[in-house]
A protein has these predicted regions:
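Non-cytosolic membrane-interface motifs at loop->transmembrane helix junctions
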Residues: 30-38, 93-106, 158-169
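Selected alpha-helical membrane-embedding segments in polytopic membrane proteins
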Residues: 2-96
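C-terminal ends of transmembrane helices
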Residues: 50-61, 118-127, 177
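Generic serine detector
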Residues: 38, 42, 57, 62, ...
């Protein structure tokens, strides 16, 4: 099931790249402080959360699998936090959220919604076993991989804006699942 999920993620990412345009490789976000940590952390968090969700959703499997993506998720958010601190320092202590970019919100929505729907389809029967961990891990997987995919088509934003969008949505969805 994890391989099926990865195939669906690649298909969605390719479709979004075709529709929105490729930025080139590697993403310029890697040049910003914390950019590599954030990108690789999001990819690893997404993949590990996918594997974990398919483990915790099987009756008799340990709930400890739910902790598998946590180090990668911490690296992802730490990378964004590092970018925020570097940006505040570069701006002389000013905190600029840069809310003018609705293109960023559109890109996040166009990438994450199909990924989340596919993941929820893959675990639709598993919700009976452990509904909260299954939902939280499914959302973390979709959020992590969509964050990485968005960076392929959308330029660097304010690190604080990125943290607010991705971090806020992950926290909101996890709270809603609880």
């Amino acid at each position: 099931r994890t391989l099926a999920w990865c195939g669906a993620v690649v298909a969605v990412a390719l479709l979004v790249v075709v529709l929105m345009g490729w930025r080139g490789a590697p993403p310029e976000d890697f040049a910003h402080p914390g950019g590599r940590w954030s990108w690789w952390g999001s990819v690893l968090a997404g993949l590990l959360a996918a594997y974990a969700v398919f483990q915790v959703s099987v009756p008799g499997r340990s709930l400890a699998w739910a902790w598998l993506p946590m180090p990668a998720a911490i690296a992802w958010f730490a990378g964004m936090g590092w970018g925020c601190l570097a940006q505040v320092r570069a701006d002389g202590g000013a905190v600029a959220l840069g809310l003018g970019s609705w293109h960023c919100a559109l890109a996040i929505t166009l990438v994450s919604a199909p990924m989340l729907l596919v993941m929820l389809l893959l675990v639709r029967h598993a919700g009976v076993v452990r509904p909260v961990p299954t939902t939280v891990l499914a959302m973390l997987s979709a959020a992590g991989l969509s964050s990485a995919a968005v960076s392929l088509v959308h330029g660097h934003e304010s690190a604080l804006l990125t943290l607010a969008w991705h971090g806020g949505v992950v926290l909101l969805l996890c709270a809603a699942a609880w």
